Swiss-Prot record:
GO terms for biological process: proteasome-mediated ubiquitin-dependent protein catabolic process; protein ubiquitination. Interacts with cul3. ANK repeats lie at residues 85-114. Probable substrate-specific adapter of an E3 ubiquitin-protein ligase complex which mediates the ubiquitination and subsequent proteasomal degradation of target proteins. Keywords: ANK repeat, Cytoplasm, Repeat, Ubl conjugation, Ubl conjugation pathway. It is found in: Cytoplasm. Pathway: Protein modification; protein ubiquitination. This is BTB/POZ domain-containing protein 3. Ubiquitinated and targeted for cul3-dependent degradation. Its main location: cytoplasm. GO terms for cellular component: cytoplasm; cytosol; nucleus; ubiquitin ligase complex.
Amino acid sequence: MASQDQNTGTTHVELQGGENSKKLFSKYDLWSKAMDEKKLSSSLFTVNDTQEFLELCEACRRGDLEVVKSLVENYNTPINQVDQFDYSPLVLASLCGHEPVVKFLLENGALCERDTFQGERCLYGALNDNIRRMLLSYDITKAIDESQPYASHITSLLSNSALHFTTDIVFAGQYGRVFAHKFYLAARSSYFKSKFSKLGPSEHEIEVKHFAKEFESILRYLYLDTNAVFTKQYNNALLSIGKKFQLNDFIALYEKDREQLHSRDWKKIQLAKTQNDLGEFLDYIISNYKVPIESLNQPSDQYSFHDAYLQSYTHRYPVHRAIMCRCEYFLDMLAGPFLESNQELPVLSLPFSSSVVEIVLKFLYTDKTDIAPELALDVVYVADMLSLDKDRSLKSLASIVITKQEEPIDSIYDILRTAWDTSTPRLEQYASEYMANHLEHLIDDPEFCELVKESADRILQRQETDTIELIDDIRYFLSKRFGIYHEDLCIDGVVDTLTPYESEYNQKMEMIDDLLDKLELQA
């Protein structure tokens, strides 16, 4: 609540933090807080004008949780920064009343501290009491650092014995044996790339004679294990191993403040570095060892350290079981009762173009990928086939690319059929809204009529009075477009007033009714 002191002309802002707690700030206090914060921090809440951050802000305005999750978790887009208008993603989400987005941002480290300008602004601007209570009750220590699936998989490659069939190098020390992967360590460290390149094809074991525990701790660090232990007792050994492996960022932070190795920010930095390292390694493989299937007399590919192949319509790629197992489809093929599980170098087929297959590889190796709009529909199909269809997975990324287009590159009919075939609600809503906005151009199209019939046939044992999903969706988006609410409608589904908007709405509803009569359908 805001009030003004009549004697001094000072505006006060009252913020309620509970049933009995109140705190008053003059506008000068708030301005002072903002200036103090700006001086104290060079990275927190600084202006970020990158395209990814602006897309995050826009998604928070709209309440598009799927896009927000994708940008934060797949692309590591920062959330504690502001756009050119000084709005952070959390402020935008709370201001626009999107509770699921607010909850997600808080769980992923968004700051809302009551004694800061951005925190007070977020609380004061919250659209409803539910969001305000969520912000007030939230303690930053409650932040859920949910195991990111990508990082979790990388860690499990070292720690999960069920995935040891993907390993090809063993480090044997006095405390036991550690199973690892040549390709992964070669991608993360130039030392290992050089070391493994000198090993013969039958050499799969290296003896660790000294500091075996410290060596294992460094390996766990490289595999993103958050429980890697770095003891004070062997500082020199850890630093020596780090220097040998050329882990300059690890050495710098360990010497400065080793406790930061377990901080949230450092984990995000290492996750991004791992994605970058594996992305560069994959680019190297594609550039040097991608082979047309009509000429499989391949060049030497010993530096790819592969243990499988992935084959598109036209090309074959050396790949790694450890990464392919991120996909349940390939995991079943490589670990289940199938021929591929018994082959030394199995060939996994993916019946799509090389461009689409390379998008799949990029996603599996890095958890992110750039998808050209003209390929996005095929990517939705391949992601559905491979069961890469969970939140912020490959199907989600491809769907976002399609729905960002004002004018679709593919046929809107193909997009809707793809949505039906792959159970993708985001695409279905996009196609229905597009059809509602362009109804006058589509209503006489024979293919549109056929699509309405298909929608009617999607209801098993359809009765005469059952609704048609596509028609219901189009009617919904028409009412949303023209601002017509259910209580405004007459019994026949139209409005009885004659404002220009309502008149146009009635015309479009009549067009739909005429089409249904023509098709002898009721909905």
